[in-house]
Amino acid sequence: MPEVTARGIRFHVQTMDPPPADPARGAASDPPVVVFVHGLVVDDLSSFYYTLAGPVSAAGARAVLYDLRGHGRSERTPAGYSAADAVADLFGVLDALGHRRPVYLVANSFGGVVALNAALARPERVAGLVMIESYGPAERAGEWTENMLNTLGKSALVLEYERLADQLLAIGWRQRGRQARTADALVNGTSLLDDLAAIEPVRPADLAAVTCPVLAVYGEHSDIVDAGRLLLRSVPECTLHIMSGHAHTVLREGTEQLLAVMLRWLAHHAGTRVPVMAMAGGAL
């Protein structure tokens, strides 16, 4: 299992290199680095590994995936789940891997909180953002954290008192059982919920300070589609793509359309190739 140690914590990482002979780039040119930042609790790097990372790598980028602190196969600590900690973890992982040039961050759901704050904290290290159904942007405190905390609070009770992990394992659902056990330990055994409650939204004035290009992709029926519209209004260089007929599960249920949009955007900004399937996709 590939691991790196950053800030004294073990992180599970996976990397995918582009094809060795990439006609889209000169032989002496380093490929762009695209880093994938997943969502909370039941999510991990596998959600990107089986959807976006392979095609992005095949298009000529070096894909970097990692499990957030306490998620997947990364080390779980009792505390340290604030946005600032997540940003420091991200750059710690990149430093451990030797990636110090500006990178492109592809974020899903809560991963957007990490990506946005990373772009604001270290603009010299972030070349661009792809925000997929991402939390973070809001005009007022509590706009998205209240719903998220309510959902996680209910999940915490089910995991702890109904012993969901044991039930899933008992009927042979091993992967889901392991995920539930990890989620139980995370929400009931760490400072995660308290740290989330303290996170401030990224307001319009801060969004206006984002210096890198941003691609925002949201589902038409998503509860947080207004976050995408706020990004479009506030970020100086932002492209918004709303996926018709979709809600929050764009990454899983709209992968092909999402890839078409994202690969064209990366080709324009990062210099990767545009595969035939992406050329046939909808326009930005």
Where are these regions (language model features)?
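Active-site loop/oxyanion-hole signature of alpha/beta-hydrolase fold enzymes
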Residues: 54, 65-104, 260
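Conserved loop-alpha-helix segment in the C-terminal half of the alpha/beta-hydrolase fold
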Residues: 214-246
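Gly/Ala-rich beta-loop-alpha elbow adjacent to hydrolase catalytic centers
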Residues: 107, 111, 115
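Residue in the alpha/beta-hydrolase core beta-strand immediately N-terminal to the catalytic nucleophile
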Residues: 103-104, 127-130
